[in-house]
Amino acid sequence: MRALIILGLVLLSVTVQGKIFERCELARTLKKLGLDGYKGVSLANWVCLAKWESGYNTEATNYNPGDESTDYGIFQINSRYWCNNGKTPGAVDACHISCSALLQNNIADAVACAKRVVSDPQGIRAWVAWRNHCQNKDVSQYVKGCGV
């Protein structure tokens, strides 16, 4: 009986772990989900953004004490403007999505919300990590050898 309980706990912990994408795996997935060239943003820029926002980790979160918001998932989408975590004061929820949906291994919801973010006037510049690490840089290395 004890062995079954331990096995159950191990299996439970495996199911809640986030996925850390390999660079090319992410590039292929983002391409399939329609991000390559979306709103004029190249696939390499999206992969660069994900690298510096989350390290390609779907389960990444970052709490921002200044405004009591949290960034979620592979693109670190913020609960102040884009998703609903039920905790952020004055949240907008422009993507009409639960923030927990942005932590799934299947990143379709995260991509859909990222498309919403990049559709705003600020575009890809909404992401600080993109401005700091990808803007005006040769980002071709992020898709090199990926066959995309």
UniProtKB/Swiss-Prot annotation:
GO CC annotation: extracellular region
UniProt-recorded Gene Ontology molecular function terms: lysozyme activity
Enzyme Commission numbers on file: 3.2.1.17
Active site (UniProt): E53, D71
Gene3D superfamilies given in the database record: 1.10.530.10
Pfam families: Lys
Cited function: Lysozymes have primarily a bacteriolytic function; those in tissues and body fluids are associated with the monocyte-macrophage system and enhance the activity of immunoagents. Also plays a role in digestion in this species.
PANTHER family registered for this protein in UniProt: LYSOZYME C
Family according to the record: Belongs to the glycosyl hydrolase 22 family.
Protein name listed in UniProt: Lysozyme C
Origin species: Trachypithecus obscurus
Origin organism lineage: Eukaryota, Metazoa, Chordata, Craniata, Vertebrata
